[in-house]
């Protein structure tokens, strides 16, 4: 009996020793594998960094990272070693996301990541207080973070052709230096309140959205000189549009406008308008032009057309007041 106990104890002791050895061996193998993976990562990071350094150029005194038509679905953390960069230009790289560490590039002035497959903008973007231009057109972005409003130096923001953006956070009205905004080819049904309240905005493109009407408060954009609203579903224009005294270019082609408000003749600075492809209820034609075919084409639904339309609209209104029932359908001065 005693011999059996001793034998069992010896076996257990040997088993325990072997289990410890096996456990230690597995731990050593795991550490070695992790170390090898770490070496591979370090090597890959160094290779990536070398490749990235080859893409750095200097133009007009700026340090620029320029990559085009090369596959970079993600950007390595080794990029942080190039924190002196002032401009990124990454086009058609298949980039899936803006790195979370983007906020550490405090010298960035221009961030151009257009024509990629980016689906979101990280909140860290708000740390780029020197950023003047953010160009993210032709991506797959759906929402814009409120933190973007912290980019106090931002002057130009382009989010065109993301298809699904339908609103902007109200905080973006705090972008006091923003003068240029491109929201074309998205999913907006109205002009966001944030846009209406941007104090310095001069140039706005909301073409190819789903706008049905313009708010009366559009007159708030007193510094706006260019407004693109082509290819929407706008049915009428507010009377307050005539209060936009600095507006020089207004494009309203391919909408559902049935009339041109008379008050628009008060817009003294208006130099270019386009009402082409709208179901306007009055049919008016212009006198023959002595200009080139290009000029004639441009003016066919342009400023002269607008003034002629308004004159005809006013003339018809006067006739109705005077009780006349025989009115011409159109103005035609072809001789």
UniProtKB/Swiss-Prot annotation:
Residues 10-47 form a coiled coil. Its main location: cytoplasm. GO terms for biological process: intracellular signal transduction. It comes from the Eukaryota. The keyword NAD does not apply. LRR repeats lie at residues 84-105, 107-128, 130-151, 153-176, 177-197, 200-221, 223-244, 246-267, 269-290. The keyword Acetylation does not apply. It is found in: Cytoplasm, Myofibril, Sarcomere, M line. Pfam families: LRR_14, LRR_8. Keywords: Coiled coil, Cytoplasm, Leucine-rich repeat, Muscle protein, Repeat. Highly expressed in skeletal muscle and heart. Not detected in other tissues tested. GO terms for cellular component: M band. Interacts with MYH7 (via C-terminus). Component of the sarcomeric M-band which plays a role in myocyte response to biomechanical stress. May regulate expression of other M-band proteins via an SRF-dependent pathway. Important for normal contractile function in heart. This is Leucine-rich repeat-containing protein 39. The lineage of its organism: Eukaryota, Metazoa, Chordata, Craniata, Vertebrata.
């Amino acid at each position: 009996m005693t011999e059996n106990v001793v034998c069992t104890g010896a076996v257990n002791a040997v088993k325990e020793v072997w289990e410890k050895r096996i456990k230690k061996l597995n731990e050593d193998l795991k550490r070695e594998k992790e170390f090898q993976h770490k070496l591979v990562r370090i090597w890959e990071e160094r290779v990536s960094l070398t490749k990235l350094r080859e893409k750095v150029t200097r133009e007009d005194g700026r340090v620029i990272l320029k990559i085009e038509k090369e596959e970079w679905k993600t950007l390595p953390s080794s990029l942080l070693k190039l924190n002196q960069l002032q401009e990124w230009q990454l086009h058609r790289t298949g980039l899936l996301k803006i790195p979370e560490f983007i906020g550490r590039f405090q010298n960035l002035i221009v961030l151009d990541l257009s024509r990629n497959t980016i689906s979101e903008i990280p909140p860290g973007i708000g740390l780029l207080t020197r950023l003047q231009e953010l160009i993210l057109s032709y991506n797959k972005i759906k929402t814009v973070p409120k933190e973007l409003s912290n980019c106090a130096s931002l002057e130009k923001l382009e989010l065109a052709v993301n298809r699904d953006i339908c609103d902007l956070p109200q905080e973006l009205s705090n972008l006091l230096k923003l003068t240029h905004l491109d929201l074309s080819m998205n999913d907006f049904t109205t002009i966001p309140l944030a846009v209406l309240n941007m104090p310095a905005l001069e140039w706005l493109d909301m073409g190819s959205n789903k706008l049905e009407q313009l708010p009366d408060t559009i007159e708030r954009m007193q510094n706006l000189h260019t407004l693109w609203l082509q290819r929407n579903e706008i049915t009428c224009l507010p009377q307050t549009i005539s209060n936009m005294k600095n507006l020089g270019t207004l494009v309203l082609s391919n909408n559902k406008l049935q009339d041109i408000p008379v008050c628009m003749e008060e817009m003294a600075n208006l130099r270019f308008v386009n009402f082409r492809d709208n179901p306007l209820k009055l049919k008016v034609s212009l006198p023959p032009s002595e200009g080139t075919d290009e000029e004639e084409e441009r003016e066919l639904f342009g400023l002269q057309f607008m003034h002629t339309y308004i004159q005809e609209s006013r003339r018809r209104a006067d006739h109705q007041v005077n009780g006349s029932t025989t009115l011409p359908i159109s103005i035609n001065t072809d001789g």
